[in-house]
């Protein structure tokens, strides 16, 4: 009987451990949703265009009734290559001091984009086998389809995906 009681106690302890672990996942998912949809995206409305537009369009939107602030964002489909490694990913161009669409790392720290170079997730850095200071060849898959080399200036840990960010002015110049 003592052995049977011990096994029962161990079984109950393991059941509680599984329950606590599963509850932690709910908290983690809630935290991720809060960061991605409440903290990072402070805008009420996003307007997307199929093709890049001039900054004049942003000024026109800013003049509409009820609009308090605007902020440009540009997502460019691209192939990124480093050596023999290649990944298809969007390069997202954001203002250096973004307010409406902010980027956070997995620790909750807000990332500030430097004036030049790419800031990529650690997952993308791992897939391309690159680090800070290495150069990546970026082949844009839209418009004139330019190909350019850009340095990796920072990496960050993220919850989801393998994003790449750049200052929007630097992206527009390329």
Protein language model features and the residues they cover:
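Alpha-helical transmembrane segments of bacterial inner-membrane membrane proteins
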Residues: 1-174
